[in-house]
Amino acid sequence: NRDHLISLSRLNVHKAINENIRAVGMTSRWIQDDDSISIFNLAQPSFSIEGIPLCLRPTFIQLHVPHHPWIDFFPFPRMRDCMILAGDSFDDDDLCHDLMAFWDTRNTATTLLVWGDSWDAKNWEITEGFAQKWKWLLLDSPELLASTNRWRKFRGEKPFIWKDILTEA
């Protein structure tokens, strides 16, 4: 049924995040502590970004603004910067729940979908519910918006009209 599909989709996001954790050189233990600081903010003499997939490489903001490492695992640089700059002004637990709470079927329309290699932004898609709820994260994320419509077109669905979704009250 549809609830199981959404649960599987969230499980895929969980898997994708874990793959991206490894791709940037961290372990899942690194993010378990609420007080963890991104590896990109710590002095790492042997650390090199050369081996990190392009979409996951740290931005200037990631390198200079201390933040929790969970933000580093999304392949959307502008969205990561937006989350870091927002600081404590948004409920990151609520966002995490929408993305990865595969055990909860109450709010199934608000999630991300991952269709391929997790480090490639072209393999991610957002649902309309996610776009409406978290639109402030998407206003400067054209790669995620383009990828979403590419996947919708692939399935024969109408593309989202972003100006309508992102400007709705």
Role assignments for model-derived ranges:
Residues 1-169:
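Transcription factor C-terminal regulatory/effector domains that mediate ligand binding, dimerization
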